[in-house]
Amino acid sequence: ETGVNCMDLYTPDPDLRSRVGRALRGRREQFVLQAHLCTVWQNGQYKATRDIGEVRASFEDVLRRLETDYIDVGMIHYVDTMDTWNTVANGEVMRYALEQKRAGRIRCIGLSSHNPEVALAAVESGLVEVLMFSVNPCYDLQPAGENCEALWAEESYAGMLVNMDPARERLYETCQRLGVGITVMKAFGGGDLLTADSPAGVALTVEQCIHYALTRPAVASVMSGVHTSAELAASLAYETAPDSARDYAAALATFPKISWRGHCMYCGHCAPCPKGIDVASVTKFLNLARAQGMVPETAVSYTHLTLP
């Protein structure tokens, strides 16, 4: 009814899966479904697993409960360490995912991670077509690590932070260059960024967080986690919000312990250019070319730029 057509189903909760399946009856083709491999429901609780028997059973369950014969994105769940990635990439989980893709039951293979170094390895392997990654202006400042809880730990923001972490910047640029789409999780930092107790020390709005994520290279969609209809409405308000409400640059400039000086955030806040140049897009393409050392495949996008 509101135009939402992309949905992430990380949870293996059988009741939720069945409810979604009933809601999609007669209109499955109108939706892009991202469902996770390696999650199971045991004793009324979610559990991550790499046991191939459990992975197979859970995937069959999600197809049955969603009343469909395919998933658009089969997302390999929660790969935050290099050891886990190596196990997945060279083991039964990836073989199963590839098998399901060949059978047409998975259209694209994805991987979810909070660690930019692991995510980059997955993207560069050529095995992954979609990356689910945590993207927001606070997490983007943090270095790569295998403990995702450090991303929201208070001590991680105790000192002065300057500009985006290079590993994260490289990840986004590589995804753009290789054509790997990013679906965003944690755009609001689990809600932490929307309050005055935010790690940044300043509350951001839903519109600002969504716009920040959507202006990163390669980002295709933001998966807004919602608990209520009101929270869903708040995210949907982004679609009709004016540019002034989406603008996050002024808010980022007020962060007491964070500096973005000398780093383009692709926010467009410097507009209008007296020469009519789309500075944000041109700078993004420049950074992509610098990262690759040559004019990248994304040069085709240059044709969409408006000439002054």
Which sequence ranges carry the predicted segments?
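Structural motif corresponding to the early beta-alpha repeats
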Residues: 26-53, 76-80
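Conserved small/polar residues in nucleotide/adenosyl-binding loops
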Residues: 303-308
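Beta/alpha (TIM)-barrel catalytic core signal, keyed to glycine-rich beta->alpha loops juxtaposed to Asp/Glu
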Residues: 1, 79-284, 291-298
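Glycine-centered flexible beta-alpha turn that most often forms the glycine-rich phosphate-binding loop
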Residues: 7, 71, 109
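Active-site groove signature of glycoside hydrolases
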Residues: 66-84
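N-terminal binding-site loop/beta-alpha segment at the start of enzyme catalytic domains
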Residues: 1-37, 102
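An active-site-proximal structural segment forming one wall of the substrate-binding cleft
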Residues: 52-66
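Acidic (Asp/Glu)-rich catalytic clusters
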Residues: 21-29, 64-67, 123-126, 177
